[in-house]
């Protein structure tokens, strides 16, 4: 007798549910996607005990026809696909017809639904079987209640994290959906407390203000761009709002949230040296494309996708982010409102580096599974100044459009103190900003975008009434200022009518020299300096194999390495722009970079060499300068392409506005 047999439907559904329904947030995601696909304009999500006890999703979408109710909980029963070709033209968020069947096999489900001009219906499903089907009073749309999740698969409950973690994952999903569908009013309520309530205005920047707070929202920069195959639209936050993990990066394709390593890399390359090591930006990017260019049928959660013409999209994202910050004033304003806790001791640089590397290793191990506890629990919780997560607890009031006052009041992470929030002029200005935001990003008109940023950035940076915006004269991105002196032989102090400035002299010269060396390394030049006595380098056999493979790449950065017999190589000339006293050291460092990587990306090699040379040749800390030397340094910095951060992403200049200084000394209350 044969051993192979077909599994019972209930058992097969439980197995399938393990792929689709991983945790409570998976249920929320699937039901929310169904509501959006049904054309809903209002969606309410209510959870109890972080969704373990119950999840209820109510929408005003099209509803389910009475004759379809018998099929709705069957596996692979869907209205979104009809034939094979449809799989390559998917525009809906769901399409497999697996979600409801999987959910009902591991939970108790009650569904009420009603379509236009029809009577409502209610069905109750347990263990995948419809136990009750009756007429019921219902509004147009669908009301689905999921209770006792994993009641019949207790082993799954053991792997549920803390309720706080599960709520964080639910919040993450709902917030991302709200960003990608700003035209839908979405409310998330946990145990009777409102976690999120959007107004459905259609403006993504307003949703981001609700999620991240007004301080971040005011510093969002709009990006938009096209190729023959792609259109991208989104917002990128200024570098000062960077975070310690990459989960604040939100990428959508045709409204679907996705994770993609190459697109993440494109965003980071767009920011380039504006971010320090271990810091990641806040950004939202939606990519519109023909569905035939993307395969979303790769992973059960539909988070992973495969893209055609990925390199073209990569370059588009990089160029648009770079354009967004080009010629823009990015001097971060000092935050005097934050006072560290008394028992909080700053770690040494070495300790911070160790912690960062440990965190990176952990994140890299978890990235493929998308199940990192950090990944979904942290992103869209509001952070306070200590990078601690704070869950806002508003009273339950779904679908209520928040006024500008309430948006400001909710911004617990903004860093403004109570004294200033009581100032009537300040509130008036914030109201004007929000009203301006309401009218700004409806078009791609650069003038309207710049006008908004001119007004919104008044509190961000005070200089020449062009705060945080593009400067017509690039040399005026660094304001003219009077040199006052120097602190600890490291920081230059300057002032003008708008306040005080601190300039890191090492970082400033590092930026200047980096741009010089970067351009020189990229030049093809015949101007070389011959050596009377060639430099000799000795390498092991395995090192020789690598060097011989990449001799041409070394020539592209000016190093003519010749085999001299045995394990020896010589260099008899070098580019004239090499510092004479460091020729041997620079060549050694270049070769070591190649030996370390065991491969060569010529662009990265030039970048690494330029950073290395600029760091070594720059003024160090505890080096005292004369006033004219400080002035010359700032004048040179003013000529730089990106004068606000060093090549490692650290800030070069910080502004203390006159108001902030007066507040520090209690001259204003």
Curated annotation (Swiss-Prot):
Question: Does the record carry DNA damage as a key word?
Answer: yes
Which residue ranges have biased composition labelled Polar residues?
Answer: 361-377
- Tell me what this protein is called: DNA mismatch repair protein MutL
Question: Region annotation Disordered: residue ranges?
Answer: 356-377
Species classification? Bacteria, Bacillati, Bacillota, Bacilli, Bacillales
Tell whether DNA damage is among the UniProt keywords. yes
UniProt lists the family membership as follows: Belongs to the DNA mismatch repair MutL/HexB family.
Q: Name one GO cellular component term.
A: mismatch repair complex
| Signal peptide stretch | none
Pfam families the UniProt entry points to: DNA_mis_repair (PF01119), HATPase_c_3 (PF13589), MutL_C (PF08676)
User: Which GO biological-process labels does this protein carry?
Assistant: mismatch repair
Q: Where are the disulfide bridges? A: none
Highest taxon above the source species = Bacteria
GO MF annotations in UniProt: ATP binding; ATP hydrolysis activity; ATP-dependent DNA damage sensor activity; mismatched DNA binding
- Sum up the protein's function in the record's words: This protein is involved in the repair of mismatches in DNA. It is required for dam-dependent methyl-directed DNA mismatch repair. May act as a 'molecular matchmaker', a protein that promotes the formation of a stable complex between two or more DNA-binding proteins in an ATP-dependent manner without itself being part of a final effector complex.
SUPFAM superfamilies, A to Z:
ATPase domain of HSP90 chaperone/DNA topoisomerase II/histidine kinase, DNA mismatch repair protein MutL, Ribosomal protein S5 domain 2-like
- Keywords, ordered alphabetically: DNA damage, DNA repair
